[in-house]
UniProtKB/Swiss-Prot annotation:
Disruption phenotype: Knockout mice lacking Alg13 display occasional spontaneous seizures and hyperactivation of the TORC1 signaling pathway.
Record domain OTU: where: 225-346
Keyword vocabulary terms for this entry: Endoplasmic reticulum, Glycosyltransferase, Hydrolase, Membrane, Multifunctional enzyme, Protease, Thiol protease, Transferase, Ubl conjugation pathway
Protein name as annotated: UDP-N-acetylglucosamine transferase subunit ALG13
Region described as Disordered: 393-438, 921-966, 998-1056
PROSITE patterns to which the protein is assigned, alphabetical: OTU, TUDOR
InterPro entries: Alg13-like, Glyco_trans_28_C, OTU_ALG13, OTU_dom, Papain-like_cys_pep_sf, Tudor
GO MF annotations, alphabetized: cysteine-type deubiquitinase activity; N-acetylglucosaminyldiphosphodolichol N-acetylglucosaminyltransferase activity
Originating organism: Mus musculus (Mouse)
Pro residues: compositionally biased ranges: 921-930, 941-957, 1004-1034
EC numbers on record: 2.4.1.141
SUPFAM superfamilies, per database record: Cysteine proteinases, Tudor/PWWP/MBT, UDP-Glycosyltransferase/glycogen phosphorylase
Residue numbers spanned by region Glycosyltransferase activity: 1-125
Length: 1166
């Protein structure tokens, strides 16, 4: 009775136990003569039930005090890879098969089993079924090997242990018995030729094939077939047919041409299977790079009188593609990727291996005149020294037998085999897998592939090897070197058609054989061209080019320094978003956008050409030199590139990588390439992550002159705006570009200015007397910024609105004054403010406002502190000089925002003059009343604008169906919410809602002198001349017709409210000075009628009484709107005046429509 003992020690190895007690395994044990099986299951959960039959007995237990008795009685030991079990079995001299538990990690079982196997003491494997060409369980391999070892002589078995000199004898003896033992098992015959390399040899082989291919090889091997791999290209079908017809694959092109010709001659039989043009299909089929399919198989079957049988799926019978009744068959294997391989029988493989060996022997003996003994010795050395590779080739896989190493590796391996034969005793040669490479390769005889072909037991796939070699050469040719640079297929590059010509973006598609030129696809032309390598250059991602005006940079704070910053337009245009993001560098904890100019001194662009350059998003930004020493020039380009206008690259479209104080993205400002676009972008509430950049910067938002929603083309010139971020101390070291003359005024900063100009000019006038070469394109506007500077213009009244975190400096020329901490100065000219509208003033708390001189000493500025964002905002009415109350601010001659305030009002700003005012200019004619809609309500004399023809009025919405409304829903949402917000502000003064009572029916009273001294940086008109500022009725009528396109009759309604006196929310002042109680129904009583001063009504946009939207919600409710004023339209016609009632108003009568004739165009945030 033969006994097999299976042990797992103290571990748990349920998979091994389950495999051993399986029915198929028990039957194999019985067929091999084993009739008693003992299982030691250890801690496992799988515990089979013992049973006893007449032919087989199964005993099961978990632990014993000692395994010596079972090991002594066992004829075969199957054990886990534990060191104790292996040593005990080897000490007993028992045949041992070790099964490695792959679920155990880092226990060195595999290394131990591999080393003992390498020394010839045991066999090892795993429980999983390998992807091998034979569908057998690994347990069959184990049991078969055990029977082989049982048949070995006892003297040989006694060699088990640690005798390395006798171990190879055991391996050789076991190998000699494998064929005889498994001759009755055809599926195992090829798989178990060399069981010692079962793990190591198959690992590489299995890694080269896909799961489908391995399963197909296993299935074909069970049928006595093998798959010969064909070159994996579009001609695989024709190669396989050529080989089966002519025993060679070199005729695949002739077979392809024959197929095309036959299908062309018999078009009626194949045309119905083709979609589209049949001629085009045949034309494509004639290309060797086009694959073939079932239609071509049908034609080839008729051409060569053979039917095709194709194996498609493992485990399923083949498919007979053609059934033409031919006796000869062509068997193919089809993969899911459309690849065809040849299928042969194993007998053909054996015969082909012998024929191949004879052919190569004749070749080397008769052609290369190699001694026969030399060939024989080389083959013997190959068989003994490269047994792993020999087994690799005998496993019926042509892929595995096709060596893919370079010739150097082949020669090295062959040299190792020769060295092994020369230095190793005869008894050790057969068990040596690989020896060290000798120092001298002079003993190398033949390449490894040649030795495989000389071995009659190996069938080498020569065709596949040749195709692989050609692919290697092709891969080597996919790279070309020129001028120290390497160019690969698919690389992007820039090429020029002729020497010194323009470079175009392209990518390499082919490399010529001579390696002197490449075939590229030029994107701009959408054409292929052969370009010499001398005209090819690589594409640089982002290049820092030297700036035009280098500024000395001193080291400080240890930050890195970049000494260049001008990025041409073509470089920025070609960069994608990912490359642009790379420009947003991080330096020691702060994020700096590379296109900003960080400098203490003058701009990088010379002042002599600054007026002739066309800027992008924002102007040059100058920060203190200690803020990182990053020197970079703003993107600029000439004015003639009108098609690129408005697409500057100073800042990205998405300013989300600028983090606000609330960690929210900065509001986006869209940009348009139209010639009428006016853009001005800075940074609103942006705090840089740096000690040097902890200042907040305000933003002057985008204004679109070409918008059709309440805008009119304007007249004037523009220049850049200079932003400053200041360090503490050193208040006079930072200066802007010098301008020419004019006073300097500082007003409280706003979150956005709505400054408009009237008139239209077909071409921009020169920016100054020295720059007269400016021109315009198509009569449009070139400047991208709202504010410009020019000598000889005065400021109008400018007031603050909403909230601010910085101060604004209205500078005309010369070096600017440098404010203190948390002050940001804005440099823009006064001409833009010509005919501009006064802006409503915030009624927040103010501190005394000093005036400090600038660096040059010839300008004066008015300093204000930050305006609190927590206080309520009241409407402000800006009349001409009239008798008023301290509750309102009176505009000064200089247009300062904190010009007048009551001494009793704690929130009123107080101005302290520091320098004497300039002399007053002579009186000038008043501006036309149409400027009221453009934003000018000051009434002070200003220089008359040139007399250009009035522009056509912007279109209004007249269609009741709303078809002429803007299509952008976000724009509609914004203005709807704006009107709704005004509706809910029912606690405002009724003058806000009734523009028709603003008509001046009586003379205006004189303004009261203010107790506080007023700064006088600008000329102030005489108080006794208020009537000169009002145009005659005929001129007013004409201006209304020009702006609105239609005239309205004068309003004869009596005024209802005293507009000259301030109205407090809680009180109503009558004409007699008494107060009227406020009604409890949320309305105000109507005051006595008094003469009304002439002027526009301006009110601030209040904060949303219903709360701000949630974070992340893209709402268009104008919460604390950045639009500084909303000019009122004065239609007095009954048909045009609205009859809507304002709930909660003092006099809910008819009101006029409101529109924004010159307010900034709302840009939706994407």
């Amino acid at each position: 009775m033969k006994r097999a003992f299976v042990t797992v020690g103290t571990t748990s190895f349920d998979e091994l136990v389950a495999r051993v007690v399986a029915n198929d395994c028990v039957q194999i044990l019985e067929s091999l003569g084993y009739n008693h099986l003992v299982l030691q299951v250890g801690r496992g959960t799988v515990v089979p039930k013992p049973f006893r039959t007449e032919s087989f007995t199964l005993d099961v237990y978990r632990y014993k005090d000692s395994l010596k008795e079972d090991l002594q009685q066992a004829d075969l030991v199957i054990s886990h890879a534990g060191a104790g079990s292996c040593l005990e079995s080897l000490e007993k001299g028992k045949p041992l098969v070790v099964v490695v538990n792959e679920k155990l990690m880092n226990n060195h079982q595999f290394e131990l089993a591999k080393q003992l196997h390498k020394e010839g003491h045991l066999f090892y494997c795993t429980c999983r079924v390998l992807s091998c060409p034979a569908p057998v369980s690994l347990l069959l391999v184990l049991l078969g090997s055990a029977k082989i070892l049982q048949q070995l002589p006892s003297a040989t078995l006694s060699c088990f242990g640690y005798l390395p000199t006798q171990a190879p004898v055991l391996v050789a003896t076991a190998y000699s018995y494998l064929h005889s033992v498994f001759s009755s098992f055809p599926p195992l015959s090829t798989f178990l030729i060399i069981p010692c390399t079962m793990q190591k040899g198959w690992k590489k082989y299995c890694g080269q094939k896909s799961l489908n291919e391995a399963s197909m090889d296993e299935y074909l091997g069970s049928l006595g077939l093998f798959r010969k791999v064909v070159a994996k290209d579009a001609s695989c079908l024709f190669r396989a047919i050529s080989e089966q017809l002519f025993h060679s694959q070199i005729h695949h092109l002739q077979i392809r041409r024959a197929c095309v010709s036959y299908m062309k001659e018999n078009q009626q039989a194949f045309e119905s299977y083709v979609e589209g043009s049949f001629e085009k299909y045949l034309e494509r089929l004639g290309d060797p790079k086009e694959s073939a399919g079932q239609l071509e198989l049908k034609a080839l079957s008729l051409i060569y009188n053979r039917d095709f049988i194709i194996y498609r799926y493992p485990g399923k019978p083949p498919t007979q593609v053609t059934d033409n009744g031919f006796e000869d068959k062509i068997i193919l294997c089809y993969s899911n990727n459309g690849h065809y391989d040849s299928v042969y029988s194993k007998e053909f493989q054996s015969t082909a291996g012998i024929c191949q060996a004879i052919l190569y022997e004749l070749l080397y003996k008769d052609v290369f005149v190699v001694d026969e003994e030399t060939l024989k010795t080389a083959v013997d050395l190959f068989r003994s020294g490269s047994r792993r590779n020999k087994h690799h080739a005998l496993t019926a896989s042509v892929e595995g037998s096709s060596d893919q190493k370079s010739s150097t590796e082949d020669r090295t391996e062959e040299a190792a085999a020769c060295s092994s034969a020369a230095s190793t005793p005869e008894g050790n040669k057969q068990g040596t897998e690989r020896q060290k490479v000798p120092e001298s390769p002079s003993k190398m005889l033949f390449p490894y592939k040649v030795l495989k072909a000389l071995d009659p037991e190996i069938y080498r796939n020569v065709e596949f090897d040749a195709w692989l070699d050609s692919r290697k050469e092709l891969q080597k040719s996919e790279c070309v070197e020129y001028g120290g640079r390497y160019y690969f297929l698919g690389d992007k590059c820039q090429v020029c058609m002729e020497s010194g010509g323009k470079y175009y973006n392209a990518h390499i598609q082919e490399i010529d054989n001579d390696k002197s030129s490449v075939v590229v696809f030029i994107e701009e032309f959408a054409e292929r061209h052969s370009i010499p390598l001398a005209h090819v250059r690589p594409v640089n991602q982002v290049a820092l080019l030297p700036s035009w005006n280098a500024i000395p940079i001193r080291n400080g704070r240890g930050y890195p320094t970049i000494t260049g910053g001008y990025f041409p337009e073509i470089v920025m245009t070609d960069m994608n978003m990912k490359q642009r993001k790379k420009m947003f560098k991080k330096f020691r904890g702060k994020e700096i956008y590379m296109t900003m100019a960080y400098s203490r001194g003058d701009p990088l662009v010379p002042s002599r050409i600054q007026h002739s350059m066309h800027y992008g998003h924002d102007p040059l930004l100058y920060y203190s030199q200690t803020a990182g020493h990053i020197l970079s020039s703003q993107h600029f380009y000439p004015q003639h590139s009108s098609q690129r206008q408005g697409r500057g690259y100073g800042m990205p479209r998405d300013s989300s990588h600028l983090i606000s104080k609330q960690n929210l993205p900065n509001p986006k400002v869209g940009f348009c390439s139209g010639s009428g676009r006016k853009c001005c972008q800075s940074y609103d509430n942006v705090s840089y992550r740096s000690r040097s950049f902890r200042r907040s910067h305000r933003q002057m938002h985008c204004m679109n002159k070409g918008c059709q929603y309440g805008f009119a083309p304007e007249n004037g010139v523009e220049e850049t705006v200079t932003f400053y971020a200041l360090e503490e101390g050193n208040e006079t070291a930072y200066s802007t570009l010098p301008n020419n003359g004019g006073p300097t005024t500082m007003v409280p900063a706003t979150s956005g200015y709505c400054v408009a100009r009237q008139g239209y000019n077909s071409c921009k006038p020169p920016l100054n007397s020295g720059d007269s070469n400016d021109h315009c394109d198509n009569g449009g506007y070139h400047g991208d910024y709202l504010y410009s500077s020019e000598q000889g213009y005065e400021t109008s009244s400018v007031y603050t609105t909403t909230v601010s975190t910085a101060n604004l400096s209205l500078q005309d020329s010369g070096p600017s004054s440098v404010p203190q901490d948390t002050v940001t100065s804005y440099n823009y000219p006064q001409k833009v403010l010509e005919n501009s509208a006064a802006i409503a003033v915030s009624w927040a708390s103010h501190v005394p406002v000093p005036v400090i001189p600038n660096c040059a000493g010839d300008n004066e500025a008015l300093r204000t502190s930050d305006i609190s964002s927590q206080n309520a905002i009241q409407p402000g009415f800006v009349p001409p000089p009239a008798q008023g109350s301290p509750a309102y601010l009176e505009p000064s001659a200089a247009g300062a925002a904190g010009a007048a305030a009551a001494a009793a009002a704690a929130a009123a700003p107080v101005a302290t003059p520091v320098a004497a005012p300039l002399p007053l200019p002579p009186p000038l004619p008043p501006p036309p009343p149409a400027t009221l809609e453009a934003g000018d309500a000051s009434g002070f004399p200003l220089p008359p604008p040139p007399p250009p023809p009035p522009p056509p009025p912007p279109p209004y919405s007249y269609d009741p169906s709303g078809s002429d409304l803007p299509q952008d829903t976000k724009v509609l949402q914004y203005y709807f919410n704006l009107g709704l917000q005004c509706y809910h502000h029912n606690y405002w003064h009724p003058m806000v809602y009734m523009p028709h009572v603003q008509q001046q029916l009586q003379p205006q009273p004189q303004p009261q002198p203010q107790p506080q001294p007023q700064p006088q940086p600008q000329p102030q008109p005489q108080p006794q001349q208020p009537q000169q500022q009002q145009p005659p009725p005929q001129q007013q009528q004409q201006q209304q017709e020009q702006v609105h396109g239609e005239s309205y009759p004068d309003c004869t309604e009596q005024p209802l409210v005293d507009q000259s006196a301030p109205q407090v929310y809680s009180d109503v002042v009558r004409e007699d000075g008494t107060q009227a109680d406020v009604s409890t129904n949320d309305t105000f009583p109507i005051a006595d009628a008094v003469p009304l001063p002439h002027g526009a009504v301006y009110y601030p946009v209040m904060t949303d009484p219903y709360g701000s939207p949630l974070l992340g919600f893209d709402s268009y409710v104008p919460v604390a709107s950045d639009y500084s004023s909303i000019a009122m339209w004065h239609p007095v016609n009954a048909a045009c005046g609205a009859s809507a009632q304002i709930h909660g108003a003092m006099n809910p009568g008819p009101i006029g429509y409101m529109l924004l004739p010159n307010s900034p165009h709302y840009t939706p945030q994407n």
